[in-house]
Amino acid sequence: MSSEPPPPPLQPPTHQTSVGLLDTPRTRDRSPSPLRGNVVPSPLPTRRTRTFSATVRASQGPVYKGVCKCFCRSKGHGFITPADGGPDIFLHISDVEGEYVPVEGDEVTYKMCSIPPKNEKLQAVEVVITHLAPGTKHETWSGHVISN
């Protein structure tokens, strides 16, 4: 054992070191996103993480109709506007049935499931596109583009 005192704790520098990269505020140019107005749940609830009991409850529930408000394939989620009004419903990519990627204006049917942990908000599950939006290009999950 040594009788030397422990070294003093490291202190942050008292002067500002500047590299030049952080001196200027950075702004990001972004295209407007229709997803910005909606709140995406965190963590994202997916079919894979849903409990069996929640899946059973949703499957036994009523079928609703709505229109796809927006869907971003790269982000893996979007929103549905219910046909009977009310707030937009969150949609995760894992809950889309069928061969087409939803686009704005597609008519859909869906069931609803509450989003944990508080179960205050709802998400669409078992989503089926019933009518493709006219005048739009639709993509299959495998990447083929079909003009409508």
Curated annotation (Swiss-Prot):
Reported function: Binds mRNA and regulates the stability of target mRNA.
Name the InterPro entries for this protein: Ca-reg_mRNA-binding_domain, CSD, CSD_CS, CSP_DNA-bd, NA-bd_OB-fold
Database matches in Gene3D superfamilies:
Nucleic acid-binding proteins
Q: How does it assemble?
A: Homodimer. Interacts with STYX.
One of its GO biological process terms is:
regulation of mRNA stability
Keyword RNA-binding listed? The answer is: yes
> What is the source species?
Mus musculus
Q: How is it modified after translation?
A: Can be phosphorylated by DYRK2 (in vitro). Dephosphorylated by calcineurin in a Ca(2+) dependent manner.
Q: What is this protein called?
A: Calcium-regulated heat stable protein 1
Q: Name one Pfam family in it.
A: CSD
Sorted alphabetically, the keyword list is: Acetylation, Cytoplasm, Phosphoprotein, RNA-binding
List where Pro residues composition bias occurs.
1-12
**Phosphoserine (modified residue): where?**
31, 33, 42, 53, 59, 147
Principal localisation: cytoplasm
**Which residues, renumbered to this chain, carry the PTM N-acetylserine?**
2
* Sequence ranges assigned to domain CSD in this UniProt record: 63-130
Region of interest: Disordered: 1-47
What SUPFAM superfamilies does the entry give?
Answer: Nucleic acid-binding proteins (SSF50249)
Q: Name one GO molecular function term.
A: mRNA 3'-UTR binding
Q: Which residues carry this modification: Phosphothreonine?
A: 46
Query: What's in the GO CC field?
Result: cytosol; P granule; P-body
Intracellular or extracellular location(s): Cytoplasm; Cytoplasm, P-body; Cytoplasmic granule
